[in-house]
From Swiss-Prot:
Pfam families: COQ7 (PF03232). Its main location: membrane. The gene is coq7. This is 3-demethoxyubiquinol 3-hydroxylase. The lineage of its organism: Bacteria, Pseudomonadati, Pseudomonadota, Betaproteobacteria, Burkholderiales. Pathway: Cofactor biosynthesis; ubiquinone biosynthesis.
Amino acid sequence: MVLDELISEFDRGLRSLTGISRMSRPVPVPTEPTVGELTPAERAHAAGLMRVNHVGEVCAQALYQAQKLTARSASSKAMFEEAAREEEDHLAWTAHRLKELDSRPSLLNPLWYAGALAIGVAAGTLGDKVSLGFMAETERQVESHLDGHLSELPATDTASRAIVEQMRVDEVKHGKAATDAGGIELPLPARMLMRAASKVMTRTAYYL
């Protein structure tokens, strides 16, 4: 059983890094038709933002894989699995949008993935309440990050905006579920360290 689980997660990791993630839900579509074309500068900026979002989803896969494997209770394992499945949709959606924008994922995805996997293992070994608290705080920070992207994306880029808006809905749900399941609030130094690490990742991934 443990071996089967490890093989399954290894397969998911490979799919995360090779861009062949499975999509269980279709790519969100704009509620209103796109008006006008993106300028080259707008297209480049949108691509940078969506590359950052794609990196975030690569990291989410690694985090939730590690937290699922180290979780003590069956209910916690199930929660991390459900979140990972929905985040895999996000991974596929952002990859799809990057192709539409004639861009590419981050060249450093293996590094981001490995780092997030290590962090997920560390959080998981501290117990389910801490691990769920880490999940809740991660989702809160991602929610804030997506709000920022919605304010930055060109108004005419309705395709990217539709994807980010649905991602935000899912992240809020994941964070609430983790808190409701008993996730504790992380100490301020831990939250600040998470924000600092996130800034390094987002600033680098925008270009690389």
